[in-house]
From Swiss-Prot:
Record: residues binding Mg(2+): N11
GO terms for biological process, alphabetical: acetate metabolic process; anaerobic amino acid catabolic process; L-threonine catabolic process to propionate; threonine catabolic process
Cited Pfam families: Acetate_kinase (PF00871)
Site (Transition state stabilizer): H175, R236
Protein name: Propionate kinase
Known function: Catalyzes the conversion of propionyl phosphate and ADP to propionate and ATP. It can also use acetyl phosphate as phosphate group acceptor.
Primary gene name: tdcD
InterPro entries named in the record: Ac/propionate_kinase (IPR004372), Aliphatic_acid_kin_short-chain (IPR000890), Aliphatic_acid_kinase_CS (IPR023865), ATPase_NBD (IPR043129), Propionate_kinase (IPR024917)
Amino acid sequence: MNEFPVVLVINCGSSSIKFSVLDASDCEVLMSGIADGINSENAFLSVNGGEPAPLAHHSYEGALKAIAFELEKRNLNDSVALIGHRIAHGGSIFTESAIITDEVIDNIRRVSPLAPLHNYANLSGIESAQQLFPGVTQVAVFDTSFHQTMAPEAYLYGLPWKYYEELGVRRYGFHGTSHRYVSQRAHSLLNLAEDDSGLVVAHLGNGASICAVRNGQSVDTSMGMTPLEGLMMGTRSGDVDFGAMSWVASQTNQSLGDLERVVNKESGLLGISGLSSDLRVLEKAWHEGHERAQLAIKTFVHRIARHIAGHAASLRRLDGIIFTGGIGENSSLIRRLVMEHLAVLGLEIDTEMNNRSNSCGERIVSSENARVICAVIPTNEEKMIALDAIHLGKVNAPAEFA
C-alpha cells in the first residue's frame, strides 16, 4: 500500500477528458484539469485552471499520457492507488459500481450502443489507463446504476413489449452519481434516517434531471432511455409530443437525424430565447426585460416545478427538496421562482439564505414555517466516484461516507 495513496478520477466525454486527483484519506482535491478537443487539431490540456497547452497527440491515449506526465511532475504518479472511471451508461446490467475486469469491460461494450458517443470514449479511457498504470485497481462508476432500483412501472414506456424485450427500450435515467451523493448529504443535513426518508433532488445544469429518492433509493427520475427526456434544458427540448415532431418532419422534410439534432442541440433555453443556452446570459436579459429570455426562464421553471411535484408522488412522504448542479447551486432566481411555483406543497422561501453565495455551501433556503424543507447541496461527482473506488479497493474511506 502506498504511504500517501491518491485516487485518480477520469471522466472521458465525447471529445474531452476531465480528471481529478484526490487524497484517499479525506478526498481533498490535490489536482484537476481537462483535456479538450480530443481527436481534433485543437486538442489542449489545462491543469488546475491554468493556461491551455496544445497536446502533441490528439487521441484519448495521447491525452491520458499527457495527464500522467503532469502527475509525474508533481510526484503523484507512484501514489496512484486507485482509478475511478465515470461510465455514462451501464444499461440494466450494472446496478452498482464495479472493479474493472475483462468481463466488466465486455459488458460495458455490450451496452455501449445505448450511449455510443460516451461509452466508447469511456472504454478508451479504461484501456489507456490500464497501460499507463499497470496493476492499479480501476473501478467503473455508472451514471445509470443508482436508478436501477426503479420498479418496472417507473421505467417502462407504453410501447409494444417486444421493443423492451428485444431492444432494451426503457427508461434508465442519468446523473445517478450526483443524485446519490446529494441524497446522502441531504440525510445528514436534514437529520433524516436513510431508511425512512423521502427526497426530491433537482440536478439543474445545462443538462438537468429530477430524482425521487425513497429510503435512500431512486424510485423515479425524469431522464429516460437517453438524457433528452424530462426537463427542458440548455439546448435539449425535454418532454415533447412525438406527434409534434412527426408533423414537423412532414412539413419541413427533415430527416430523423435532423430532428434529433434539433431536439438535442437547438432547443430548450436556446430554442425559446433565441439568445443563449447559458442561464447566466438569460438572467441578465431577464432583468433587462428581454421577453423571450423571460419566457424561456418561465418555461424552464414551470417544467422543473411540474416534475418535482410529480416525482413527489413516488414517495410515501416528502421530507425535502434539494437543489444541486450549476444552476441549482448558483441561481437564486431559479430557486425562488421554482419555490413560488410550488406553494401548493407548502414551500416558503427564506430570502436571505436563498440569496447567499454558493460559497456558503450546504444550507437550508426555506423558511422555518415551510411545510417542506428546501436546501442547496453542492454536488461532488468526483468525490462520489473516488469514494466508490476507495470502498471497492479496500482503502480506508473518509468517516462521513464510511
